[in-house]
């Protein structure tokens, strides 16, 4: 079962090993308390060039290291070193298809006190066959969740802390059990925060609006890339401000962004059609630019990409 989803090799306790050997004890501290920091990274296969491109590799590892330090984890690697390790795993696994990369930093100590000091941090990296996380071709139906996004003064959403994703799991499960594809969470002030694992944008009168980082959201790497594409390629004004729940229903278009979600249109929220209930024109254009950029098909955005194979 493991083989059908995960790839052959992983980075574990300082070396690349067969993925079956990358195992932790059930007594591992972070397993009990969620005191781990993770990232999600995609690599895209370009068939014409026969090249695998890692998207925003350095940026993801820089964020992981920054977030890890916030949990008092001092990892003995630079972002550049982690990128090289990731390339080596991909090459050793002979990956020639789209793949998801999951790095996770955790405390490996076999102790049961919920604290962040006097423990030993470790980092693991593995590969995963992922495919589409949500339906980017037809759009999805979303539900505004009864669960509120974590407040920055409890567990900051700007950090990818494993334990904080119970909040996401509650919201996502509620949405799925109610017949929807995804959840949209409000923050403690009642404004729109984000999806269970995605940032959110609305389009109104030709302008893109998205919650600012102060609205208890993850400062998404894909979010930043999408803002760049909207401004430079589509010449769409982008405003960062609080979004009221009711603005979701009156938006012309809504879409979600994230490493996993990529650019996912939302065509219905709480049984209300968004616009005409189909993917909007700005979202369609944005998707075209984004999917071409991540596969290395737009030269000016190859700076976002790290090639894996030497040519």
Swiss-Prot record:
Its cofactor is pyridoxal 5'-phosphate. GO terms for molecular function: L-isoleucine-2-oxoglutarate transaminase activity; L-leucine-2-oxoglutarate transaminase activity; L-valine-2-oxoglutarate transaminase activity. The modification N6-(pyridoxal phosphate)lysine is found at residue 160. GO terms for biological process: carboxylic acid metabolic process; isoleucine biosynthetic process; L-leucine biosynthetic process; L-valine biosynthetic process. Keywords: Amino-acid biosynthesis, Aminotransferase, Branched-chain amino acid biosynthesis, Pyridoxal phosphate, Transferase. Pathway: Amino-acid biosynthesis; L-isoleucine biosynthesis; L-isoleucine from 2-oxobutanoate: step 4/4; Amino-acid biosynthesis; L-leucine biosynthesis; L-leucine from 3-methyl-2-oxobutanoate: step 4/4; Amino-acid biosynthesis; L-valine biosynthesis; L-valine from pyruvate: step 4/4. Its EC number is 2.6.1.42. The keyword Transferase applies. It holds the Pfam family Aminotran_4. It catalyses: L-leucine + 2-oxoglutarate = 4-methyl-2-oxopentanoate + L-glutamate; L-isoleucine + 2-oxoglutarate = (S)-3-methyl-2-oxopentanoate + L-glutamate; L-valine + 2-oxoglutarate = 3-methyl-2-oxobutanoate + L-glutamate. Acts on leucine, isoleucine and valine. NCBIfam families: ilvE_I, PRK06606.1. This is Probable branched-chain-amino-acid aminotransferase.
């Amino acid at each position: 079962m493991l083989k059908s989803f995960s790839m052959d090799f992983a980075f574990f306790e300082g070396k690349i090993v067969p993925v079956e050997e990358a195992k932790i004890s059930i007594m591992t501290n972070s397993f009990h308390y969620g005191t781990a920091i993770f990232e999600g990274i995609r690599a895209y296969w370009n068939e014409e060039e026969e090249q695998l491109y890692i998207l925003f590799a350095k940026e993801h590892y820089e964020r992981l290291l920054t977030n890890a330090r916030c949990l008092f984890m001092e990892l003995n690697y630079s972002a550049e070193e982690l990128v090289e390790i990731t390339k080596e795993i991909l090459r050793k696994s002979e990956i020639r298809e789209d793949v998801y990369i999951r790095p996770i930093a955790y405390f490996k100590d076999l102790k049961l006190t919920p604290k962040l000091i006097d423990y030993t941090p470790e980092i693991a990296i593995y590969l995963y066959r992922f495919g589409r996380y949500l339906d980017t071709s037809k759009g999805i139906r979303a539900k505004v969740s009864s669960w509120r996004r974590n407040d920055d003064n409890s567990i900051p959403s700007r950090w990818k802390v494993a334990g904080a994703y119970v909040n996401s799991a509650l919201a996502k499960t509620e949405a799925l059990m109610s017949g929807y594809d995804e959840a949209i969470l409000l923050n403690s002030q009642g404004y729109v925060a984000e999806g269970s694992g995605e940032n959110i944008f609305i389009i109104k009168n030709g302008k893109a609006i998205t919650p600012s980082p102060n609205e208890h959201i993850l400062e998404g790497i894909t979010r930043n890339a999408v803002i760049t594409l909207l401004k430079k390629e589509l010449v769409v004004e982008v405003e960062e401000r609080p979004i009221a729940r009711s603005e979701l229903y009156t938006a012309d278009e809504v879409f979600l962004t994230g490493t996993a979600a990529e650019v996912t249109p939302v065509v219905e929220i709480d049984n209300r059609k968004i616009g005409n209930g189909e993917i909007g024109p700005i979202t369609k254009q944005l998707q075209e630019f984004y999917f071409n950029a991540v596969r290395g098909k737009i030269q000016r955005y190859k700076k976002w990409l790290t090639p894996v194979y030497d040519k």
